[in-house]
Amino acid sequence: MNSDSVICLASLSNYCQYHILGIINNRIVPILIDTGASWSHISASFLKTHQIKNCEEKSVRRFDGTTKKLNKKTLIEIDLSGIQNVKLELYVDEEPNKILLGTDFLENFYFKIESDCLFLNQNQHPRFKLHEDKIFEIIQDLTIPNGI
């Protein structure tokens, strides 16, 4: 991968999960990218805190085969690493993760996993960067209970 790629550090608890910083409503927020999740979601408490509206309801199938009804979904714009804006439709959920991006998000990118890093690249589209020193700050914040 070249230096125009986003680099995400693997979660200490799950090899399929990676962390990145994004900006929503002019606030820097930690985002979890899960290569094992089929759909992306955002917590209802995050929407309420940041005054983001939601709409529509849908049922989704979970990794274990069960179905979960998500009452709403919302369209938000995330600025990844200060360079690229990505518009995403996220389902609203009561899960503890504030923002989780799944394979529905990853389908928009060429991605590669090497060691403990996930590299995202939009090929012909504008690219964005994340400096490795910021990754370690994210991990430290995420390992502190209620740190985010």
UniProtKB/Swiss-Prot annotation:
One of the Pfam families matching this protein, by short name = gag-asp_proteas
Q: SUPFAM superfamilies from the xrefs?
A: Acid proteases (SSF50630)
The record ties this protein, via InterPro entries, to: Aspartic_peptidase_AS, Peptidase_aspartic_dom_sf
Q: Which GO terms describe its molecular function?
A: aspartic-type endopeptidase activity
Protein name according to UniProt:
Uncharacterized protein 7
Biological process (GO) annotations held by this record are:
proteolysis
List the source organism.
Answer: Soybean chlorotic mottle virus
Task: List all membrane-crossing ranges.
Answer: none
Q: Which CDD domains match?
A: retropepsin_like
